Amino acid sequence: MSETDMKLVVVGAAGRMGQTLIRTVHEAAGVRLHAAIERSNSPFIGRDAGELAGLGPIGVPITDKPLEAFVEAEGVLDFTAPAGTVEFAGLAAQARIVHVIGTTGCSADDEAKIRAAARHARVVKSGNMSLGVNLLGVLTETAARALSAKDWDIEILEMHHRHKVDAPSGTALLLGEAAAKGRGIDLADQAVKVRDGHTGPRPQGTIGFATLRGGLVVGEHSVILAGEGELVTLSHSATDRSIFARGAVAAALWGRSQKPGFYTMLDVLGLN
């Protein structure tokens, strides 16, 4: 541990992703766990964060006081829920620190509040923090631009574990936005997220989404470009959620030297 290590806070510390973040921060170079936060009625308040994450004691108790933690830290890693993320965005803006957001399912109003907080904080937000998925997004945009809507249909298929509460996934939407950008269209106008009953022929130029849920699947995503007589499939499989945690740590370290503003993983990876 070095005095120059970036001091990070993990919020939602008791969740699956929170525990993964704690382990990743503990093992990564250039960062250290400053605090771990849970909701005020959590039975884990007071527990050692390292013990909860399977590391053994690390001397960082779980607390329910985010602002106190934020003002002494340099960054926060947030894979919680939209309401919590909006609250943490305001606190991160007060503390003027880096806020890395992997939370999905945010509404347009949530997004507006997060972007407002980015006037004072350095916000890095992405539907997926992994290098592979963000590269897949770039490839999807390129393919969508090269293959015309007249002859090629785009469908996005995703599968996640049974506990995931939002659909389509943030990653599927990220890929949909990439495809829409390649086509020069607005995803909100062209997305088809539900098909049921007699739907009629597929409208030209739309981008379809299909969602699967079951088991303990970390994340499977495929972008399918279907033409006449040929099929192009671009896919990514996540086998360990630590890939998202490593990406979040990389985003925090990158954001440390940036000006306040709203960024994505494409900025972090130099792909924008």
Swiss-Prot record:
Reaction catalysis annotation: (S)-2,3,4,5-tetrahydrodipicolinate + NAD(+) + H2O = (2S,4S)-4-hydroxy-2,3,4,5-tetrahydrodipicolinate + NADH + H(+); (S)-2,3,4,5-tetrahydrodipicolinate + NADP(+) + H2O = (2S,4S)-4-hydroxy-2,3,4,5-tetrahydrodipicolinate + NADPH + H(+)
GO molecular function terms noted in the UniProt entry: 4-hydroxy-tetrahydrodipicolinate reductase; NAD binding; NADP binding; oxidoreductase activity, acting on CH or CH2 groups, NAD or NADP as acceptor
KW Lipid metabolism (keyword) present: no
Top EC group: oxidoreductase
Active site location: 160 (proton donor/acceptor), 164 (proton donor)
Metabolic or biological pathway: Amino-acid biosynthesis; L-lysine biosynthesis via DAP pathway; (S)-tetrahydrodipicolinate from L-aspartate: step 4/4
UniProt xrefs under SUPFAM superfamilies: Glyceraldehyde-3-phosphate dehydrogenase-like, C-terminal domain, NAD(P)-binding Rossmann-fold domains
Intracellular or extracellular location(s): Cytoplasm
Pfam families: DapB_C, DapB_N
Main location per the UniProt record: cytoplasm
GO CC, one annotated term: cytosol
GO biological process, one term: diaminopimelate biosynthetic process
Matching InterPro entries: DapB_C (IPR022663), DapB_N (IPR000846), DapB_N_CS (IPR022664), DHDPR_bac (IPR023940), NAD(P)-bd_dom_sf (IPR036291)
Annotated residues for binding of NADP(+): 39
Residues reported in the UniProt entry to bind (S)-2,3,4,5-tetrahydrodipicolinate: 161, 170-171
Tree of life domain: Bacteria
Positions annotated to bind NAD(+): 12-17, 38, 102-104, 126-129
Keywords: Amino-acid biosynthesis, Cytoplasm, Diaminopimelate biosynthesis, Lysine biosynthesis, NAD, NADP, Oxidoreductase
Functional summary from the UniProt entry: Catalyzes the conversion of 4-hydroxy-tetrahydrodipicolinate (HTPA) to tetrahydrodipicolinate.
Family membership: Belongs to the DapB family.
UniProt name for this protein: 4-hydroxy-tetrahydrodipicolinate reductase
UniProt gene name: dapB
